[in-house]
C-alpha cells in the first residue's frame, strides 16, 4: 500500500488523495459471491483499512467515500433470504438520512457490477418502506427513527447498516465506527440471524468487532 501512496519519484499523496487512490484499487476488484475462493475483492476491503492507516486525520469527504465503498463491497459478501438474484435484476441499496453518502455511493457504483448485477441507489424519505431493498444504510441524521428503520430492514430481509453509537443496540447488522479517525465496522451475528442473512467469514475477518449470535 505504501507503494501506491508514495511511488518512487513522486510526492506523497495528501490524506484525502491517498484514500481516493486506495478506493480506486478497492473498487476495481469486482465483488464476488460468498462461496467463491477468489480473495481479490476482500483484499480490496482490506486496502480501505490499510489506506486509512496511512492517511492520518482523513477529511469528512474521505470518510464519506470510504463508507460508500464499504457499502458497495458488503453486497458481495451476504447471502440474502430470497436466494440469488434473477438474471438482469439489480441490487437495490436504500439510503436514509445521509444524502451525501447516497450521492457518493451512486457515483462509485455507476457502471460497476456485483456478481454480474448492477447496483441501484434509492434515496428514502419519510414514510418509505424497505420492501425490495437488499441493503439499507441509515445515516446518523435519522436519529429517533433508527430503530424503526432497522426493524423494517429486518422484515424485508435487507442488510441494515448504521453509523451511530446505538446502531448495534438498535438491531443493526453492521454499524460503522470511527477508531482513531479511521472508518471501521462492527457486526452483530445475532441481528444477521434474525434477518435470515448469512455473512461471509471473509467479511467478518475485516470487521473491527463481531458480536456472536445464538447459534
Model segments located where?
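Short hydrophobic alpha-helices and adjacent helix-cap/hinge residues
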Residues: 2-215
